[in-house]
Amino acid sequence: MASILALDGLYAEVPKFLPEALREGCAGKNPLSFYIQQILNLMGCDGNEYHVLFTGSSEEANTHMIMAAVRRHLLRTQQRPHVIIGAAEPPSVTECVKALAQEKRCVYTIIPLKNFEIDPVAVYDAIQSNTCLACISGTNAVVKTFNKLQDISKVLKGIPLHSEVSELVYQGCIKQNPPADSFSINSLYGFLGVGVLGMKKKVMQGLGPLIFGGGLRGGSPNIPGIHAMYRTLTQQRPSMKKINTIHKLFMKTLKKHQHVYLPIGGVSAEDTSAENISTKDIPVEGPKELPGYILFSVGRRAEELQKKIFTKFNIKVGRIVDLQEILFRIKIPQKYWETLLFIQLRDNLTKEDIKRVMVVLMHLDTITPRGSLPPPSYSSSFS
C-alpha cells in the first residue's frame, strides 16, 4: 500500500530462518499442546484460562467468533443480536457483520475514531440490551495506535470483547495491552496459512460446539506453519520494534509540523511565502472527524490512492497533499527525498532502506526548524 501511514510494506521481507523453521515443523518434534502453551506464554496469558484453536488465518478466527456469538444469541432470545465494531477494523470483521445485517440476522454500531483510538466512553454509549459482542482490534489498522482493550472490556460489563491483536503480538506489546475475552492472531507471513483463535473459557459457555464443532473440526493442524509462526513470534520482534519506532517518530513529526503541512485554504503553491500567509489562514488541526489524517500522494496517483485507502479502511474524511511541497516547506534536504518516497511508493523495503528512513526521521525530529516555510523564489518548483 502506498501510504506513509501504513508501513506494512516493511513487514514483507521474509526472514532467513523461515524455511528452516518450516522443515523443523515438518519433523513434528513438538506436540500441538506445546505451541498452544508457548504462544499463550508469549502473550502473557494463563494457559489454564484460555481455549485455543488454530485456524487458517485471523480472518477465519474473526468470522468464527462473530458467527458463534450471533448464533448463540439467536438461539437464546427472540431479539435480533447487536454487534459493536470499531472504525478501521479488518475487512473480515466489517464484511462479516455487514453480511449478517443484510440477512437481518443482526444489527450493528460502528464506533468512530477519536484521536486515532476507540474511546471506551463511546463503546459504553453504544451498548444495547441485545448487544452480544464487541469487536475492537488491539491497534488502529490505519496508524497503528493502541486501543485501550482493558478499559473497553470494563465498560462492556460482561459482554464479550473480541480483538485482532497480531500487531500487538509481533511488536512485543501484548503483555502491556492484553486481550480481554477472545483474540485472533494472523501469521506474519501469509503463505503459511496459520491463524489463532483464543478465548477465555468463561466466554466459551454455549460457544464451544458452535466454534469447535464438538471436537469434530475437520482436517489436521498445520504443524509446520504453526512452528514457523512460533519461531517468528520469538525471533522477529526486534525488527518489528524498530519498524514501530520509525512509525511513531514519523507520526510525532507530522503532528509537530501539522500547521505547516496541512493545506492552506485559498493560498496557492506560488503564494506560500511568509509575507503572503495570514496566521488565521493556517489551520491548527485537521478535519474534526479524524484529526491530522493525511494521505501523501505524488502526481496523478492521488485519486487512485485515496480510493484504495479510504475504501479499505472505511474512512470518508481526509486530505490529499503534495509530498514534494511538504518536504520543501519543512526544509528537508533534497538528498533525503528519495528515502521518503520509498515509504510512499515501494511495497518491499530492505534493511538498508529502513536505516535510511531512520536517518531522515531523526533529522526531521531534531534538526528541522518548526514551522519553516520556503522562500517565494523556490515556490514555483512545486507548482
Swiss-Prot record:
Name one cellular component (GO) term: virion component
Keywords for this protein: Late protein, Pyridoxal phosphate, Virion
Q: Which cofactor does it need?
A: pyridoxal 5'-phosphate
Q: Where in the cell is it found?
A: Virion
Q: Its family?
A: Belongs to the class-V pyridoxal-phosphate-dependent aminotransferase family. NifS/IscS subfamily.
What Pfam families does its record include?
Answer: Aminotran_5
Q: What induces it?
A: Expressed in the late phase of the viral replicative cycle.
- Which PANTHER family would you find in this protein's record? CYSTEINE DESULFURASE, CYSTEINE DESULFURYLASE FAMILY MEMBER
What is this protein's record name?
Answer: NifS-like protein
Q: Which InterPro entries match?
A: Aminotrans_V_dom, PyrdxlP-dep_Trfase, PyrdxlP-dep_Trfase_major
Keyword Nucleus, does the record have it? no
Q: Where does pyridoxal 5'-phosphate bind?
A: S58, E59, S184, I185, N186
Major location, coarse class?
virion
